[in-house]
Amino acid sequence: MEYNFVEVYDNVVDKQTCENIIKHFEEVKNAGLSIDRQSKEGVAKLTKDTDMYDLTETPDLLPSNSITSANDKIIFQTFKEAFWNCYNQYITKYDLTQTTTHTLDGYVKIQKTVPGQGYHVWHWEQDSVHHGHRLLLVMLYLNDVEEGGETEFLYQGIRVKPKQGSIMICPGSFTHTHRGNPTLTGEKYVMNTWAVYIN
């Protein structure tokens, strides 16, 4: 049994659900409600280059929009259920059940990457005092990518290939420095968030 703390759980979310989430993202994007990360985060194209939409567990607190409100709730709940199934397997394997209390972050990102785009620089999730509560990175791959688009880990020498319906979980610390490689053919859709400390 390997203990590199990078776990991939296949076929967690079914094909139709993944495609419905992608369809929802495209509707949001066409309505002008998605953002590009360069604009939002003020980063260079060579650093982060993707389109992104933030889901929240409480969309009712945001300005009402007929496209987002109902669908956001459904998608968030679907992601949440899939996450807890994988999370329980993860914490059992790595014996995290007795140490700390965690929950799923209240925000989930849906991201679209087209050929040439990606999160090109090496980075980790606990990269500032504001992000120190991020225990685990959680990523759901919404479609298969034939070439490129892997999540690559610097120190583990691992490349996780996007596979529709699979969830990847890894630690948020510098030990799991990673990057999103550019897609070479086709588009890549993912959802990601974090398991965070409650206290």
Name every feature range the model reports, one short phrase each.
Residues 1-167, 175-199:
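Fe(II)/2-oxoglutarate oxygenase catalytic core
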